[in-house]
A protein has these predicted regions:
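Active-site phosphate-binding and catalytic loops of NTP-dependent enzymes
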Residues: 170, 179-189, 243, 293-303, ...
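C-terminal effector/interaction modules appended to NTPase cores
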Residues: 1-26, 33, 37-38, 43-53, ...
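Canonical P-loop GTPase G-domain recognition
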Residues: 275-354
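P-loop NTPase switch module centered on the Walker A-proximal segment
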Residues: 131-133, 139-218, 230-240
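Conserved nucleotide-binding/hydrolysis micro-motifs of P-loop NTPases
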Residues: 213-214, 236-240, 272-277, 311-315, ...
Length: 561
């Protein structure tokens, strides 16, 4: 009996393996039968529609995109088939590179003419990041504004309203135009950057809707790094504005972040005024609290605007003549939010600079292979260009350029674009990498000197302080390796060399060194990142420094070491 028990225990794993092999074999048969079921009756694959979905063949009823499983196939077998066991891995196939339309000199001439024509027409392109404390109504405001402008159709609006009602979040219906993931809709908060296009009479605006929750500040930084201007949304209801503006609230931090990343224009939408009965004193009080902080942060009063709105009702967004706006019109006769956005000024673009495109996102295109998105921070790119990915030594060809759902032959500095690339394995494309022309590569550095401004820190910065360094969509561990000098904030003159500590509101020059992570091993060295001095490229020379979930400093790169 003991021998039988021992034999049984030894043979059990073998029997389990045999069952697993049988299940895998059955799963493979199920895959083959399912594929056979997905073809037309004549034996050839069914024709595909433009979007890649299977078209209806003949006069029969339309079928869903999923193949019907064969009879007798268990759920476990279907689950195993989803693992693609036994299938060969698809490898990217090199395609003939597309031909460039223009020689480089002709391309610059074409771009200059187009930009001049755009300015003469008065239709300038500008990117706008929407910021503010969590639950201030950012996504709701932008969703309602798009609807008012006709950029959100009635069918989509109704679908969002029905869907949000089903999950008990009907008040978030307008926000669903931006909050597209299941988790965002279930939690009722924005978690990642959402991008939409909006046309006003004189501007073509790319909207970057940023998350307001402090847990998603890194995503907010990624969006702010792609923006020309900012729209700050604040909640006027009692206690809510104070919660966002006091220490720990995201209103303050978001303003500091966007200014540190080069944004110089900000529009403040004082939202939810209908919930305080359109109280003018409340509106004035909020404006008076924000104005000195905006100046302190570096925003000039001439480039700052305030607009009272009620996003849910659509009051003073694009139309001031609604009957519901009567309580507001009793004391306010200024511009609508649309009027203010229509006057935003995009900064100057340097199309002659070397091409720099920090990758903000990598994804699989529906029809054109691998795609990357990001903002062009210098130069100009056209279809057919061969681009290099740094870090690394991989190259690719630009197959298609898209912006705001429009295909372009070329795109210039300042544009937020999606590039479809060929002749490159997607594994070599990473968020934070930079695309450039092969003969004008961006330098890589693991240490550099920087001029920083220290914010309202509780613990002073000392030599050896470990931090998180943010540069566009990349965040890496780093160390303040040396305190070079404290500086006069106005003149930049050296006040003290080799200080021991840096306290709040201090301007200083420091040396920063990247740190290797625990994942790379104990004896590994830090990997350099693509970065440039501020004097060479302003967009590529700005940095943010965070510690313990708070932004403690921001600055510009002085010299690569």
């Amino acid at each position: 009996m003991i021998l039988m028990t021992l034999f049984s225990s030894l043979s059990a794993p073998t029997a389990a393996k045999e069952r697993e092999k049988a299940q895998k074999a059955a799963a493979q048969r199920a895959i083959q039968e399912a594929k056979s079921a997905g073809t037309s009756r004549a034996g050839s694959p069914a024709p595909k529609k433009k979007g890649g979905s299977v078209a209806k063949s003949g006069g029969g009823a339309a079928k869903s995109g999923a193949a019907t499983p064969a009879r007798g196939v268990s759920q476990q077998q279907l689950d195993l088939s989803g693992l693609n066991i036994g299938e060969k891995e698809e490898k990217p196939v090199d395609e003939p590179p597309p031909k460039a339309v223009f020689a480089r000199e002709k391309l610059l001439e074409e771009a200059r003419r187009a930009i001049e024509a755009e300015e003469a027409r008065g239709k300038k392109a500008v990117s706008l990041v929407v910021i503010g404390h969590v639950d201030a109504g950012k996504s709701t405001l932008m969703g309602r504004l798009l609807y008012e402008l006709g950029a959100l159709d009635e069918k989509t609006r109704s679908a969002n309203e029905r869907g949000s009602s089903k999950v008990g979040k009907r008040s978030f219906a307008w926000a669903w135009n931006f909050d597209g993931t299941l988790e965002e809709r279930e939690r009722g908060i924005t978690m990642d950057i959402a991008t939409r296009a909006m046309a006003t009479p004189h501007r073509q605006i790319t909207i970057l809707d940023a998350p307001g929750h402090k847990d998603f500040v890194p995503n907010m930084i990624s969006g702010a790094a792609q923006a020309d201007c900012a729209l700050l949304v604040v909640d006027a209801t009692t206690g809510e504005f104070e919660s966002g503006f006091e220490r720990g609230g995201q209103t303050r931090e978001h303003l500091i972040l966007v200014r540190s990343l080069g944004v110089t224009q900000v529009v403040v939408a004082v939202n939810k005024l209908d919930q305080v009965n359109w109280d003018r004193d409340r509106y004035d009080d909020i404006c008076e609290q924000l104005k000195p902080f905006l100046v302190q942060t570096g925003f000039q009063p001439s480039k700052t605007s305030f607009v009272p709105v009620a996003a849910m009702q659509g009051i003073n967004l694009a139309n001031r003549d609604d009957e519901e706006a009567a309580p507001l019109k009793a004391w306010y006769d200024g511009p609508t939010l649309l009027d203010v956005l229509d006057q935003l000024d995009p900064p100057a673009r340097d199309i002659t600079a070397p091409l720099r495109i920090p990758i903000a996102n990598v994804f699989k295109g529906s029809t054109s292979g691998t795609a990357v998105s990001g903002r062009i921070c210098g130069g100009i790119v056209q279809v057919g260009d061969r681009v290099r990915v740094l870090p690394g030594d991989e190259t690719a060809y630009v197959k298609t350029i898209e912006t705001e759902d429009e295909s372009l032959v070329w795109a210039a500095s300042g544009s937020n674009v999606t590039l479809y690339l060929t002749n490159i394995d997607p594994i070599n494309l990473n968020i934070g990498s930079v695309l450039c022309l092969p003969h004008e590569p961006i330098p890589l550095a693991a240490s550099f000197s920087a001029r920083i401004i220290v914010f309202d820190v509780q613990i002073p910065i000392t030599t050896g302080t470990t931090v998180e360094l943010f540069h566009h969509s990349r965040d890496v561990p780093a160390t303040i390796s040396k305190l070079v000098a404290t500086l006069d904030r106005g003149t930049g003159k050296v006040l003290k060399e080799h200080p021991r500590v840096l306290t709040k509101s201090t301007s200083a020059e420091v040396c920063i060194s990247l740190r290797a992570t625990a994942m790379t091993g104990p004896n590994s060295v830090a990997k350099p990142i693509p970065i440039e001095p501020f004097s060479v490229n302003k967009d590529m020379g700005r940095i943010l420094i965070r510690r313990g979930g708070e932004t403690i400093a921001a600055g510009i790169v002085v010299q690569l070491l």
